[in-house]
Amino acid sequence: MGPRPSTKNPVPMMLTVRVALVLSCICPANSIDGRPLAAAGIVVTGDKAVNIYTSSQTGSIIVKLLPNLPKDKEACAKAPLDAYNRTLTTLLTPLGDSIRRIQESVTTSGGRRQKRFIGAIIGGVALGVATAAQITAAAALIQAKQNAANILRLKESIAATNEAVHEVTDGLSQLAVAVGKMQQFVNDQFNKTAQELGCIRIAQQVGVELNLYLTELTTVFGPQITSPALNKLTIQALYNLAGGNMDYLLTKLGVGNNQLSSLIGSGLITGNPILYDSQTQLLGIQVTLPSVGNLNNMRATYLETLSVSTTRGFASALVPKVVTQVGSVIEELDTSYCIETDLDLYCTRIVTFPMSPGIYSCLSGNTSACMYSKTEGALTTPYMTIKGSVIANCKMTTCRCVNPPGIISQNYGEAVSLIDKQSCNVLSLDGITLRLSGEFDATYQKNISIQDSQVIITGNLDISTELGNVNNSISNALNKLEESNSKLDKVNVKLTSTSALITYIVLTIISLVFGILSLVLACYLMYKQKAQQKTLLWLGNNTLDQMRATTKM
């Protein structure tokens, strides 16, 4: 069963129109492409159209329980008709009394309305506790009191007609259709046939049909006998009461054939008994159906994740279960306000949540941006079928191909295996045999590997384990610090005192100064020595020249 829609904030139709107008201005939506995501363990299982609805339309069905037989055949069927009439009265009188008590629980005195219907409901509930849904249903029953009174004004004419479907409009505030499933049977079997039937055969046919209809009535009104405010009549129950004539009312209320099957599956079409008259055997039911607004270009895409293989173990992708897409905008869709059918999603309100850039990039086809959570559970789904093919994690389960026989192996580093009829016609997984008919074309990406950086911890147990590892690392670090402190304690504190350090620094500076002065002095002496050598060399050369000049003379 799908989740029940929220009825706390009904959506006005003006809001529906505005939402539809805004969304219709956006460019057409493109579905999320599941081909690059399949090999990463993210499977697009399908799309559904998104609709917004409010339960605002009502109409009435007047079920004619007692058929009118042709005058010449009344005597033949008198015995089964009398028995049927007595059984009907016994079966439905508690229902009629309950309806009457609730409708009469609101009286007008002195111009003020005295609301006493809650006490009436509690009196009709076996447990003595009235829920909010029961109070709401009783309030709707009280509001339909005037319409029920108008129908009773016309009960004689409705009971006298031989038509199986008759539209009643005289003095009624809403559309009402009188239908008679048994009258339809009488018309088909007796009024439109030229064959003369014997009296005994007429009695037998009428008796059998009346008994079958009584069985249907008992099935429909079993939970309703005590209090009509407890349970609504489903669309299936309404069809049992009215037969195929139910379509006439729905068509009159504007339900098209293209929406009918989807609305029937949604359970949004319901009915509440509003009157029962034992004199004419008329049963009035108020039918409520939604007013639906289609949101153009808006669809809901359903995603499922598969446990994939990584170097850090098995993991599943962190993506929303349902996303909605309008144009290039992708957001997570909250379906708690919606009712699901096979093809449609009916919501009382549209609630979406923005996604992180990483998830958006992942769903757009960039599988390297996908994040995964470790899933070590043995019951984690290791395979999934899609369009006649299988996506399986052949490291978690044995992928045995029956035809042709063999074991399908998954290469190291591959997240999952894509198996179609090209690689295996008949596949056996955990004792389940599947005949494959689909095929993964070349557009499907394969051999995708999940990096270590893409696997994160999200589960409570895994987080506890990681916290334990962190605590162990911290303990090891503290032990190392204690060892270093013990080694520092062995060092001579006097040598590392502040005054000693200052002395060392001053002596070092003095040594550097003396060293620099010595270097400068040495350079000066070397320079002076070289100058003296040059002077002596010059004097020697002059003396030698003078001696040569004296010798020549």
UniProtKB/Swiss-Prot annotation:
Keyword Acyltransferase among record annotations: no
Signal sequence range: 1-31
Principal subcellular localization: virion
GO biological process, alphabetically ordered: fusion of virus membrane with host plasma membrane; symbiont entry into host cell
Subcellular location: Virion membrane; Host cell membrane
Post-translational modification comment from the UniProt entry: The inactive precursor F0 is glycosylated and proteolytically cleaved into F1 and F2 to be functionally active. The cleavage is mediated by cellular proteases during the transport and maturation of the polypeptide.
Topology Extracellular: residue spans: 32-500
Cytoplasmic compartment segments: 522-553
Site feature: Cleavage: 116-117
Glycosylation (residues): 85, 191, 366, 447, 471
Disulfides per UniProt: 76-199, 338-347, 362-370, 394-399, 401-424
Coiled coil spans: 142-170, 466-491
InterPro entries linked to this entry: Fusion_F0_Paramyxovir (IPR000776)
GO cellular component, one term: membrane
Membrane topology summary: Single-pass type I membrane protein; Single-pass membrane protein
The entry's keywords: Cleavage on pair of basic residues, Coiled coil, Disulfide bond, Fusion of virus membrane with host cell membrane, Fusion of virus membrane with host membrane, Glycoprotein, Host cell membrane, Host membrane, Lipoprotein, Membrane, Palmitate, Signal, Transmembrane, Transmembrane helix, Viral envelope protein, Viral penetration into host cytoplasm, Virion, Virus entry into host cell
Transmembrane domains' residue ranges: 501-521
Covalent lipid adducts (S-palmitoyl cysteine), residues: 523
Spans annotated as Fusion peptide: 117-141
Superkingdom assignment: Viruses
Gene3D superfamilies membership: 1.10.287.2480, 6.10.10.110, Head and neck region of the ectodomain of NDV fusion glycoprotein (2.60.40.1690), Newcastle disease virus like domain (2.40.490.10)
Quaternary structure annotation from Swiss-Prot or TrEMBL: Homotrimer of disulfide-linked F1-F2.
Family membership noted in the UniProt record: Belongs to the paramyxoviruses fusion glycoprotein family.
UniProt function note: Class I viral fusion protein. Under the current model, the protein has at least 3 conformational states: pre-fusion native state, pre-hairpin intermediate state, and post-fusion hairpin state. During viral and plasma cell membrane fusion, the heptad repeat (HR) regions assume a trimer-of-hairpins structure, positioning the fusion peptide in close proximity to the C-terminal region of the ectodomain. The formation of this structure appears to drive apposition and subsequent fusion of viral and plasma cell membranes.
Protein name (database record): Fusion glycoprotein F0
Organism of this sequence: Newcastle disease virus (strain Beaudette C/45) (NDV)
